[in-house]
Amino acid sequence: MQLPANLAPISVEQDWQHTTAYPPLGFTPFAEGALGNGDTFGLYWPIGREAAEPIVVETWHDEWRVQPHFSSLAAFLSAYATAEDEYVATPSLADDPASPRAAYLEARELIAQRKPDAAIALLEAALAIVPEYTDALTLLHVQYVRAGRIDEAARVAIQAIISPPSFGGPPFKALQWLRTQPVPDGEPDPIWRACGQLSFNFGGSKENADYPVLLAAIDTYLEQGNYLSASTLMQTYAELMSAETVSFQERYAFAPAAFIARQIAVSAQLPNGSRDTSTLWLPDLA
C-alpha cells in the first residue's frame, strides 16, 4: 500500500487493527479533525487502488457510514488548515476537484437541473477513485438506464449490489432493475445469475435467504480469480452480517474474527497486495 508523501502533519493511529467489519478494511484513523464522538477522519485505500496514495474519508459512526470527502491527504490538510473551530467540512469541487463526495453531491444537483451528461461524467470520475462508492454507483446506474446504456447499467448495478453499505445504498433500484434483465448466455457473474434470489431486506427476521446467495457468490468470485469483486463483496457481507443479532450470526455460522481473517487473506491476492493497514507500520516498512 502506498503511503502519502508526507505523513508528518497528522497523528496516525499506527496500532490500528481491523477487527470489526466497520470501519472497512483499508482504513486507518488519524487524530486531526476528529469530533470526539466516534466520528473521525482517516486514510482509506479504495479496493484495487492499493498502489496509489490513499484518499481521506470521514466515518459517521452512528450511521455506520464512510464519506469519501478528500481525494488526498494534501487536500484534507489544506481544508484542515483553514477550518473554523477545527471542523473540516465537506469540500466543494472548487476546493478539491477530485473529491469523490463533492463529485457525487454536484452530480445530484446537475441531475436536478436536467444535465445528465455532466452528472454522469462526475460520477464516473468519483468511481474511478472509489470503485465501491455505493451511493455514486446507484445514482450512476439510474442515469445509464435513462440514457439507454444498458450494458453499462448492468455492470454498474452488479457493482452497486456487491458494494458496502458503509458507502451508501441500499441498492434496491439497481437490484430490481437487474432482475428484469435477461441473463446473457454464459454470463460468468454470480450476482447477475442469482439476482432473482436476492431481496436486500436485512434485519428483523430469524432467517434471510440472501446470505447463502452472497456467500456462494464470494466463493464463485474466488474460483474465478476475481479477487476485486470477492474482496468487495466480503466487506459487504461482513457489514451486513455484523448488523444482525449474535443468535442470527450463529445460525448462519458467521464467526466475525474468522471471517475478517479470511477477508484479509483474500485481499493479499489483489494485484497490488494486502489491504491490511497494520502492516504499513512494521519496522521494515515504516
Kindly label every feature range from the protein language model:
Residues 53-91:
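Compact, glycine/acidic-enriched structural inserts
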Residues 1-48, 84, 95, 100-103, ...:
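A surface-exposed partner-binding patch
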